[in-house]
Amino acid sequence: MQEVPIVILDFGSQYTQLIARRLREVGVYCEIYPFFEPIENIRAKKPQGIILSGGPASVYEPDAPRVDKAIYELGIPVLGICYGMQLITVDFGGQVVRALEHEYGKAKLYFDPIHGKVCPLFEGTKDGQIVWMSHGDKVTELPAGFIRIAHTDNSPYAAIANEEKQIYALQFHPEVSHSQEGQKILENFARKICGITSKWDMGHFAKEQIEKIRQRVGEDKVLCALSGGVDSSVVTALLYEAIGDKLIPVFVDNGLLREGEREKVEYVFKNMLKVPLIVVDAKERFLNALQGITDPEQKRKIIGHTFIEVFEEEAKKHTDVKYLAQGTLYPDVIESVSVKGPSETIKSHHNVGGLPDWMKFELIEPLRELFKDEVRKLGLELGLPREMVYRHPFPGPGLAIRILGEVNEEALDLVRKADTILLEEIKAHGLYEKLWQSFAVLLNVKSVGVMGDKRTYENTVALRIVESSDGMTATFAHIPHDLLELISNRIINEVDGINRVVYDITSKPPGTIEWE
């Protein structure tokens, strides 16, 4: 079992993943587990420190989540954040009550020195720094052996410590960006208090993962579906580095790809990385299956079902395959275990869902310990071009769900050309990597126009350009009007069949990023 320098126990905070990301960004490897993780499992990971996350519960409620008190006896430092602080307070005999006024937002943090010295947790950070509060309960009485190490105007116990037991607790959230020096505080906990000296980065991860893959796969073969997206591209590059020709990467051209997408994928993997890529041309098959279909959900199901059929046929050609590779990421893994307890319904995550029963492959998920930004760094480490690693998310059903109405060659040609112009201009103006997604949608709407002296009655395209950090929420991008005008003029002048361009100014929620 891999050693984990910092174990984070999750009590359901919306910010828990941020704790892990902040620590990893400064080279400290950590993993998240539900608060009820058995103590023997935690001990087996040989952590040098434990962090108790925030959470929505109140510690004085009868069914409030609790931690096994044996974690305090492991002889390693513990840091509680928000709910974690309140839990530590109650576990050691202090008092927590419901606050008359909830405290949400920014506050100034002032240090309370210990024997004339600032607590090591705050070394290298400034007194009076801005921190982010988000709590409805407050500590009113400290447990025996604990002292105050920082306060705010509204929180007399903004940070507390029992230095003898190496237990520290913060009422604020150091993991969120609003806490000015929060990342430094977390780094101090890891480096100065827990004594972690190891530096974790993508170079180390790649070496470790390659060795693990080689040991596990041996002389067997691995099948991998390559879509050209970031995750599947990085999985393919990593596996090829590890096992070479024992990897069977399959790229299915469904005819629903963006301009030049197949060619780019073939160039990168066949020419640059020398990967023996299998390309299946299934354009006709997908378009025939989609004929006459206008309902978006039906489109998705048909595309998914057809992909499985094509992938299954290819898999049957390789009888000695034992493993199937998937690009599962760490957020998927975290979400699959509910903090509400083992009885809660588990949410499954499968990148290649609905595969037939006979395909009894063992799964290999080499990215399951990584966040998306780490996957991108790994891709660069493995030699993938930046353009591929930082490309915008592209939906599995491809352009089919960016065409409202029936999908056919004519519609695909229109949306593909409009999309290409949009992306060319976004890149030329240095905006591409600042945006989450930018694409064109062919609307099932025709309108009257005038071109030259002639009346036209042609198609409408909507431009969808959004900013987001994770795709869960998004806001429409405030693109300069002169750039929108340039894109619109180019599309109308260069793409026969389009005479109107509109800009989608809907955020998510209430809208979704994709139109279908």
From Swiss-Prot:
Its EC number is 6.3.5.2. It comes from the Bacteria. The keyword ATP-binding applies. The active site is at residues 82, 173, 175. Disulfide bonds: none annotated. Pathway: Purine metabolism; GMP biosynthesis; GMP from XMP (L-Gln route): step 1/1. GO terms for cellular component: cytosol. It holds the Pfam family GATase. The keyword Disulfide bond does not apply. GO terms for molecular function: ATP binding; GMP synthase activity. It is an enzyme of class 6 (ligase). NCBIfam families: guaA_Cterm, guaA_Nterm, PRK00074.1. Catalyzes the synthesis of GMP from XMP. Homodimer. This is GMP synthase [glutamine-hydrolyzing]. It comes from Nitratiruptor sp. (strain SB155-2). The gene is guaA.
